[in-house]
Amino acid sequence: MKFVIVTGMSGAGKSTAMKMMEDMGYFCIDNLPIQLLDKLIDLSNTFHSDVSKVAVGIDVRNGSGIDAIPQTLEQLRQKNFPYEILFLDAEDEVLVKRYKETRRNHPLAGSERINKGIVLEREKLQYLKDNADYIIDTSQLLTRELKIELEKIFVQNEDYKNLFITILSFGFKYGIPSDSDIVMDVRFLPNPYYVDGLRAKTGNDKEIQDYVMQFPEANEFIDKLDDMIKFLIPNYISEGKNQLVISIGCTGGKHRSVTLANELYKRLSGCNDYGLKIEHRDIGKDALRGK
């Protein structure tokens, strides 16, 4: 099992890092009481599961439990349990600025100034920083740059992709998918719903595919969409985007949109730069309601 303790200064980006590690396939537990860390590891050794990577967030919100860290880590070493420590840090003035921008108080400051809380926190976390395997200073990092730094350290799973693309067909009559990044409307194409013998079929059937793709507009559309998506993919990856939902809609989500979604899926398949899947959201909806 890959076991990572994620810690660091409040305001340095620990919560953001935990979310990114979750995207990398880690099972994440934030703000775990120190007293439960040893028990969590015992449980992970007792039960066989599909969880192979765990990230545990620990910070000064643990209160007095943070003082037990040296003893707890020593117990892990005695059990020969492998773990790594990631420590996120930032310059004091940057931390103060971030707190002021969010109008939050430092967890150790109480009624004192933020600077006082930062000093106390550094004292409490010094042992973890001294024993950290990786230290990332986020003072000058953008969110996407932090993601890149984490990927350099932790991405070892060949199944993980920087970008995962979902191609989604849908019917406008049932609403545009709320998680869409790109929405394409293919209602400009002739509708097989009104062709005898085709109404009951779907875009997964060859008869519908042949009907839709016989029109030059359909082929020109998919050519241009394919070119646009292939242009966007490397730019999205460089900006740190990890999910892309391309929604293709017609009236009912059964014929035209399914056909074009399948065509795009075929064209984007076979590339190792991203993950890819296809969904037909409304293909099973009541055909009698129109297409």
Swiss-Prot record:
GO molecular function: ATP binding; GTP binding
Binding site for GTP: D59, V60, R61, N62
InterPro entries on file: P-loop_NTPase, RapZ-like, RapZ-like_N, RapZ_C
Binding locations of ATP: G8, M9, S10, G11, A12, G13, K14, S15
UniProt KW keywords: ATP-binding, GTP-binding, Nucleotide-binding
Pfam families in the cross-refs: PapZ_C, RapZ-like_N
GTP-binding found in the keyword field: yes
Record carries keyword Repeat: no
Function: Displays ATPase and GTPase activities.
Classification via PANTHER family: RNASE ADAPTER PROTEIN RAPZ
Protein name: Nucleotide-binding protein EUBREC_0697
Species this chain originates from: Agathobacter rectalis (strain ATCC 33656 / DSM 3377 / JCM 17463 / KCTC 5835 / VPI 0990)
